[in-house]
């Protein structure tokens, strides 16, 4: 078993793992223990009351956080004609069709999000084995296959996050950076939880959002008291 660093020992000593903290107190703890030499991300884990073995209970979607994520996403768009011009005007970093597909096949993947218009999926479909494992395959459920590519680009650039539950029914995503204000982080978390509640499967019974925990890139998780949100 790996030895705990002095930092992790200090964090564990300062966080009561049996307690759910009021959101502002939880964020204050994250900031207190964020001592890395870079600006750490603030991540969230949301335990959902679903059975992830059942396909009709899996949760997947996207939402735009009111204060963004603290990083600028590079966006690649598969489209053509007027849509290509609209995508460029909206701030897309890469726009193309077969030419863009060839770049990706060569391993040139300098982007974080891939968007496609429906007519471009015949080209994108050839890249499933490359984009799929990286979570980059366009999907209409998260708004990355769309007729309105310009809006999708703007959303991606303005702090949209994509989420899906893992095999344990937990959503893992980021809600900003540790240098965000407490208000910004709280409002971003509220936006995520509102989106998740809207995406609740009709077949899911009982309590849907069972537990919410926040952490920094290098820190321990802090459970959040949901009534404080």
Swiss-Prot record:
Name of the protein in question: Large ribosomal subunit protein uL1
Lineage of origin: Bacteria, Pseudomonadati, Pseudomonadota, Gammaproteobacteria, Pasteurellales
Organism: Haemophilus ducreyi (strain 35000HP / ATCC 700724)
Role, per record: Binds directly to 23S rRNA. The L1 stalk is quite mobile in the ribosome, and is involved in E site tRNA release.
One Pfam short name: Ribosomal_L1
PANTHER family, A to Z: 54S RIBOSOMAL PROTEIN L1, MITOCHONDRIAL, LARGE RIBOSOMAL SUBUNIT PROTEIN UL1M
SUPFAM superfamilies tied to this protein: Ribosomal protein L1
GO biological processes: regulation of translation; translation
Binding partners and assembly: Part of the 50S ribosomal subunit.
Any one GO MF annotation of this record: rRNA binding
GO cellular component: cytosolic large ribosomal subunit
Entry's transmembrane regions: none
